[in-house]
Amino acid sequence: MNPRTLFSRFASRFLYLGAARNPILVAAAVICAAALSFAQTAPLSMSISGPYAFKDAPALAGYQVTVTNTSQAILSNISLSNALSSGDGAYLIAAQPSQGTCDLGGQGITTLSCSVGSLDPGASINISIAAQMVSGTMTLSSSASGLDANSAPVSAGPVQRATVHGNPLAGTPSVSISLSANPTPKDLVGGRTGTLNWTLQNSTGVRANKLVFAMVIDSRMSISSSAVTGSNAGDSVSCGAPVPGVPGTNIVFCNIDYLGGTSGGSGGSATVTQLQITVNYRSPVVSSQTTLLATGNLSFDGTDSSNPAATGQVRVK
């Protein structure tokens, strides 16, 4: 039997038998029960990271939602609800979990649900979310629910992040990260392979955390792989498979734990200030020369004063 349940039953019987005999014992039991209740932690915890502000709009914002099982048992049937609120038509473009699936986004869509299955004790799931800012403030709100080992419902959240157009709130981190795009080759014959390259550099000495790089890529490019190079071996870096974005595009999310700063990386080695992100693809066969576009959009847990977005163009013959 669960120790908390056993204690609860014992305390109830203790109170019933001893209430009339010794009020001091009753008070002690109540204090113990309250202390046990206070020490309990919710089996699910959540956090959210993303941009606090964009200098210019419209802009694509990338968020990362993390759900963690803080209990000692497997949690099952975990689902997430993600809702975007604004007053000007901002919408959710796409969402991608590190396990499981999410609904498709698109223009006019402001809620996306994700089903992520089970979560082992101590394990976490990350969900990358791309939202289109139109002109004003938008707020992403996420909550999670599931079942514990006894099939009792558990929940967490909501957690929220508001992103404003203009100056961020005082005290929030602000960093200028340079971003450039360099597809190779820039001209190629239809049916041939090419590579999309982006370079991220943070030379400010201020560390940027929880970076989300969302690449909006013409869906006629058949993506075969994507990767981040230049990070420390122990750093948390991952890129997901392409997911549908706005019509005619796919989105590839890459999540990067940090970039730049004055301290070492999570592995204790030298600080990484520059990263390269590459996407390998095969071009479509076309009847006339066509220009294909791929735009990389960078967000992190703070504000980028340079609004980093870089577009690569490829001419296919």
Residue ranges and their predicted role:
Residues 50, 67, 131, 144-146, ...:
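Hydrophobic beta-strand positions in extracellular immunoglobulin-like domains
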Residues 76-113, 117, 210-212, 216-259, ...:
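A surface/secretory-pathway sequence property marking extracellular, secreted
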Residues 115-138, 146, 255-288:
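Low-complexity, intrinsically disordered segments enriched in Ser/Thr together with acidic residues
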Residues 57-76, 190-209:
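Short beta-strand elements of extracellular/lumenal beta-sandwich folds
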Residues 40-47, 103, 139-184, 234-239, ...:
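Extracellular/luminal low-complexity Ser/Thr/Pro-rich, glycosylation-prone repeat/linker regions
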Residues 1-20:
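N-terminal secretory signal peptides that target proteins for export/translocation
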Residues 21-35:
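Bacterial N-terminal signal peptides
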Residues 48-52, 97, 114-115, 179-184:
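Surface-exposed, proline-enriched loop/turn segments that connect beta strands in immunoglobulin-like
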